[in-house]
């Protein structure tokens, strides 16, 4: 069946099919989450791509695909209430354009290999996966849009990430698209059998992993996640701080009485400098913990005063009724939200005010003890970074917790 029935329009096919495939891939991501569509999303676009010979058309097609896919995937960035609507929208569109440009090396490789369709199709999943890897590195890393994320609902195939990382899942999705495309073109049973094998392999591996993994009775940590639902317009009001702290204590009291191992509060849950001027709040919380072995993990604002300069951090701390177990300072900050890029080189950039914070990047991979294990606590965006999570594991983390403040997006 001709793809043209889906895209009868005056827009060139190399643009319209790029949009069509981008939309299909976009709705396979959360929050819509039709993850199964990722297995076929690239096929309409590939049918047109293999016919293109003009460099400009290939570049435009790749950019168009990237623009609409990323727009659908991260459109919600424009609804950040931490800044004005204009800044939030410009920030979102700029991010979409930046991410779309980052896939253009794939267009260059596609053009170079145009004499061999087989080479193009073979290289496509490799190049795309490599680009995903590089997109996860550096201060401008943004792996949030990895196509592997489309498979969150499929517990079995994503088990291969234990051995391949998230990139193996992305590669598998791309390979399935290529295999189905080739099978449709060849119409040979052998090709379809190979495609079935490619598709089934991670499912089989995942089932084996899940079914053979044996958990001991003590291989668990009892956890309570507390969501105070405090609006950002009220959170930092001085007159309401004690009320907010009391809300968190009240919501956590049942878990304390049940001796839950770990009680998790959100990112910057406490609107006070808990380890500085806010120690009276820490005493209040510990008073409630006096008869409980529970530990509380919470996000806090924090600062150090070094060389007559205040250095602010987005941080996490864990404590119980008697002991403080160290502080983690967020390592991977969000550009233009938590700091201004290059402000370390040009300090005057920190004076720009787009509604962003001016945090300092942490350096230590802090681990927290819990029963016989250790764990790392990452903050919000950091949870998307494979390299950072891997480093926590290399440092000795047995598991990872994530604290996040989605109050920036009221309908999150």
Residue ranges and their predicted role:
Residues 29-44, 69-76, 227-229, 259-273, ...:
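Short, conserved active-site loops that position catalytic residues or coordinate cofactors/metal ions
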Residues 2-210, 411:
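Membrane-embedded alpha-helical bundles of multi-pass enzymes
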């Amino acid at each position: 069946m001709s793809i043209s029935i889906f895209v009868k329009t005056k827009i060139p096919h190399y643009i319209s099919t790029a949009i069509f495939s981008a939309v299909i891939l976009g709705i396979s991501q959360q929050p819509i989450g039709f993850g199964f569509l990722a297995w076929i999303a690239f096929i309409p676009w590939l049918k047109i791509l293999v016919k293109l010979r003009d460099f400009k058309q290939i570049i435009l097609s790749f950019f168009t695909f990237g623009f609409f896919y990323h727009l659908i995937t991260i459109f919600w960035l424009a609804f950040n209430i931490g800044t004005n609507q204009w800044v939030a929208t410009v920030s979102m569109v700029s991010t979409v354009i930046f991410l779309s440009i980052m896939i253009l090396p794939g267009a260059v490789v596609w053009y170079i290999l145009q004499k061999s369709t087989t080479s193009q199709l073979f290289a496509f999943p490799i190049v795309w996966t490599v680009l995903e890897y590089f997109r996860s590195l550096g201060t401008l890393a943004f792996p949030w849009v990895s196509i592997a994320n489309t498979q969150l609902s499929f517990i079995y195939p994503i088990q291969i990430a234990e051995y391949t990382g998230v990139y193996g899942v992305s590669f598998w999705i791309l390979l399935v698209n290529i295999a189905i495309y080739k099978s449709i073109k060849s119409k040979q049973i052998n090709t379809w059998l190979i495609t079935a094998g490619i598709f089934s392999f991670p499912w089989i591996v995942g089932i084996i992993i899940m079914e053979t993994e044996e958990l001991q009775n003590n291989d668990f940590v009892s956890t309570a996640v507390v969501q105070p639902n405090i609006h950002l317009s009220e959170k930092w009001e001085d007159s309401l701080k004690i009320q907010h702290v009391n809300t968190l204590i009240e919501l956590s009291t049942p878990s304390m009485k049940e001796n839950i191992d770990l009680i998790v509060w959100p990112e910057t849950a406490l609107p006070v400098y808990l380890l500085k001027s806010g120690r009276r709040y820490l005493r209040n919380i510990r008073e409630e913990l006096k008869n409980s072995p529970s530990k509380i993990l919470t996000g806090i604002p924090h600062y150090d005063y070094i060389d007559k300069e205040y250095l602010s951090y987005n941080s996490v701390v864990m404590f119980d009724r008697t002991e403080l177990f160290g502080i983690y300072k967020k390592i991977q900050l969000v550009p233009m939200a938590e700091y201004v890029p290059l402000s370390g080189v040009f300090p005057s950039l920190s004076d720009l005010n787009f509604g962003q914070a001016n945090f300092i990047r942490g350096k230590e991979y802090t681990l927290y003890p819990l029963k016989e294990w250790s764990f790392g606590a990452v903050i919000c965006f950091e949870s998307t970074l494979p390299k950072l999570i891997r480093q926590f594991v290399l440092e000795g983390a047995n598991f990872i917790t994530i604290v996040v403040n989605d109050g920036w997006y009221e309908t999150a």
